[in-house]
């Protein structure tokens, strides 16, 4: 009978994730916002900060780099941080200027559709919102593409007023959508040219 040989046991590792860049703290240096990550980690956990960014840890990593490479890495990190800050600022500006468009279009003489555009820019999952509208109004509701290639929610029926009210009340999937950035549009169906009587 062979006896059970115990080899090296594996230890389960629980990584500490950064709330700024969502990477494990060891990889924050490769993310776009190193200084924010450092400040957050120093606030949250001093021991982890010392392990990752302390003098000993930095000296062991930088010890193998030449002075030129070290300066280049610092310059690249500063560039990345500026770029990430500009990108975040541009997104915030775009979000601020974007309007939520609620269109009412005519399908037939008495049937209408309501189209909602630009909800995804405010962090709304369009499929969840479409399902919420279908349940609320007991009608068909789906996500479809516009001719411009953007996604919109199409709801069967004239429910524009109710949707505006749901956005104001921040119901379900519509949490975080600003009620002051709503634009209502009425799209009339083009009438076919009548043929002259002979």
UniProtKB/Swiss-Prot annotation:
Entry note about domains: The SUI1 domain may be involved in RNA binding.
GO molecular function: mRNA binding; translation initiation factor activity
Domain SUI1: from-to ranges: 100-171
Record GO biological process: formation of translation preinitiation complex; nuclear-transcribed mRNA catabolic process, nonsense-mediated decay; ribosome disassembly; translation reinitiation
Gene: TMA22
Keyword Glycosyltransferase applies: no
Residue ranges the record marks as coiled coil: none
UniProt name for this protein: Translation machinery-associated protein 22
Cross-referenced InterPro entries: DENR/SUI1_TIF, DENR_C, DENR_eukaryotes, DENR_N, SUI1, SUI1_dom_sf
Keyword field: Cytoplasm, Ribonucleoprotein, Ribosomal protein
Any one Gene Ontology cellular component term annotated for this protein: ribonucleoprotein complex
Family, similarity comment: Belongs to the DENR family.
Subcellular location: Cytoplasm
Organism: Cryptococcus neoformans var. neoformans serotype D (strain B-3501A)
Subunit structure: Interacts with the 40S ribosomal subunit.
């Amino acid at each position: 009978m062979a006896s059970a040989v115990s080899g090296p046991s594996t230890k389960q590792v629980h990584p500490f994730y950064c709330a700024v860049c969502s990477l494990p703290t060891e990889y924050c240096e490769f993310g776009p916002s190193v200084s924010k990550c450092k400040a957050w980690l120093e606030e949250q956990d001093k021991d982890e900060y010392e392990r990752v960014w302390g003098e000993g840890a930095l000296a062991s990593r930088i010890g193998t780099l030449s002075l030129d490479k070290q300066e280049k890495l610092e310059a690249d990190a500063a560039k990345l941080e500026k770029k990430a800050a500009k990108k975040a600022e541009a997104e915030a500006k775009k979000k601020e200027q974007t309007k939520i468009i609620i269109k009412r279009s005519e399908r037939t003489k008495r049937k209408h559709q309501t189209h909602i555009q630009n909800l995804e820019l405010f962090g709304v999952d369009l499929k969840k919102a479409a399902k919420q509208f279908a349940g609320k109004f007991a009608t068909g509701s789906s996500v479809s593409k516009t001719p411009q290639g953007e996604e919109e929610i199409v709801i069967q029926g004239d429910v524009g007023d109710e949707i505006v009210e749901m956005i104001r009340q921040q119901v379900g999937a519509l949490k975080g959508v600003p009620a002051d950035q709503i634009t209502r549009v009425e799209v009339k169906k083009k009438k076919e040219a009548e043929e002259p009587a002979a």
